[in-house]
Amino acid sequence: MLIYDTKLKQKVPFEPLAPKKANIYVCGPTVYDDAHLGHARSAIAFDLLRRTLELSGYEVVLVRNFTDIDDKIINKAFKENKSIQELSSIYIESYTRDLNALNVKKPSLEPKASEYLDAMVSMIETLLEKNIAYKVSNGDIYLDTSKDKDYGSLSVHNSSIEFGRIGLVQEKRLEQDFVLWKSYKGDNDVGFDSPLGKGRPGWHIECSSMVFKTLALANTPYQIDIHAGGVDLLFPHHENEACQTRCAFGVEIAKYWMHNGFVNINNEKMSKSLGNSFFVKDALKNYDGEILRNYLLGVHYRSVLNFNEEDLLVSKKRLDKIYRLKQRVLGSLGNIDLNFKKEILECMQDDLNISKALSVLESMLSSMNEKLDQNPKNKALKGEILANLKFVEELLGIGFKNPTEYFQLGVKESEKQEIEKKIEERKRAKEQKDFIKADSIREELLNHKIALMDTPQGTTWEKLF
């Protein structure tokens, strides 16, 4: 298994800390709003990593957190007259619904920052005892980055550009020093009583503490195998996580770092400041979650994905082909084509090379359709095809529906009943040799994007996109 390590800037063999086990921490959302397509892409990217590792024989523990203590949450909670717990719970539920719709496997653990305050306080106390952290006059506590000789080694940033983002805070020793603890500032703030004084943790210390408490291995130079997240988190978040873990525990937080690329909307980086954020829940109003997943996984996880509906509809044709083949072979699972399994898995074992994997999939679909044309009643062949498609489902998380359900997506139950009535009406018209009426009914349904197919078993229908 090869993965691209952001720190080394190259593909490297994945050699876990424990044989055939993989511990992965994925930075989850700050839950002050609904999930956008960037969140969805990150979740799907590392869901693919997990699936690939599991099918390669690894025992995977994947932890994805919820940041439920943050300035944005506090500000919005006060604005909406809610507690931060109420607000964050709303968006945790929303995020979970969205990812379920996208067929993202549930993480092994989903810690909330608010559940690990003691661990955060303890870690900050360690940094204070080591004289690596310092308190300023308003009670805030910062980490002195000059004490970490490796600071900047992960992101390899340009300090004159990147540190300018952070801004100069009075009494900070260095501009790049970052906050570990924010003291309670009064009525429009949130604070927790602690040995550090009343206050709340900074963003970066939250993730480091959760990694330590949920995944960290003892007596190794690294706490976990893989730390993952969006490339926008590389600096300052992941850089600061790595720094404070080195300083507190004397080890690296992760052996490997993996980052997924941005999502652009019509060639512009998606951001709330530009007003072009695309919420997953809004996309799901127009497209089934499987169709959206199929599109988002179709571009290599490290590349920028330029979201547009034209490309989404083109990518849907791949799903259509899967379900067309599945439609032809409903029955019992047989023996998988071992060459196909090996070939597609090896593609994904090469840093999730999805373009090659999808090419292998397309070849299999074409080949199996040709074989079926020649041997339409061959049960062993049908069983093999179903086994191949089942492996695709397990590896890529697509193709898991019943074909009829898939081809009728987006049609309400009441509408289905009306369509069936029209089909019966058309059947009677044909029996009475009233072919003009029969054709009229077909055209009427087609105008509503419902296509009829006459088969030896009767008339079936599909929803057109």
From Swiss-Prot:
GO terms for cellular component: cytosol. It is found in: Cytoplasm. A motif ('HIGH' region) lies at residues 29-39. It is an enzyme of class 6 (ligase). Zn(2+) binds at residues 27, 207, 237, 241. Its cofactor is Zn(2+). Binds 1 zinc ion per subunit. It catalyses: tRNA(Cys) + L-cysteine + ATP = L-cysteinyl-tRNA(Cys) + AMP + diphosphate. SUPFAM superfamilies: Anticodon-binding domain of a subclass of class I aminoacyl-tRNA synthetases (SSF47323), Nucleotidylyl transferase (SSF52374). ATP binds at residue 272. Keywords: Aminoacyl-tRNA synthetase, ATP-binding, Cytoplasm, Ligase, Metal-binding, Nucleotide-binding, Protein biosynthesis, Zinc. This is Cysteine--tRNA ligase. It comes from Helicobacter acinonychis (strain Sheeba). The gene is cysS.
